[in-house]
Amino acid sequence: TTGSPQDARNAQDRAAAVGAVYLDGAIQVAPEQMGQPDTTILVSGAQAAFERGRGVLAVFGGNIVYLGDKPGAAATMDMATLSYVYGAVLGFVHGARVTEAEGLSLKAYGDIVAAMSPSYGQFLRHQAAVIDSGDFTVSQSPLSISVEATQRLERIARESGLDAQVPALAARLFRQAQDAGHGREELAALIKVLR
């Protein structure tokens, strides 16, 4: 497993104390997905060491992403991607409960989510650019739409007798963002209530 960013910094210090160079890494796939062209592995640490080891690392996966010389960068990005993954899993499993409650096909649900994921990935890339720029002017999706949608998800869960923890959390955060005046901004303005 990947350690924390501080664990990586400590490992670099220990390596340097004995004259070694340290690279930190974070595998972004399950074990059975290793060694594939699209297997993503995050790496950080000394660039010269990364360049020397690039060929060996490529055996483990085809998408080796070097994040710079900060030893904790790979662990930090791993925590960020895990935040996304676990949020997506919570949403997916809640959606499976909604699907079950209405007697619909879970296979169809999984197929729909898989088909829409590449487009949603592009949408999230746009949201990252919005946050990075600091310009939350609406260009794709105003936050207010998500306030209404998450409230509806929470209401439907309760009406169906489902556990409503996941949509309740989302509804609370989006409502908080709207109450703070961000409803007419890009969806990514939600980050302002998390800062």
Regions found by a protein language model. Give the residues of each.
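Rossmann-fold dinucleotide-binding core
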Residues: 2-82
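Helical "substrate-binding/catalytic lid" subdomain
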Residues: 73-169, 173-194
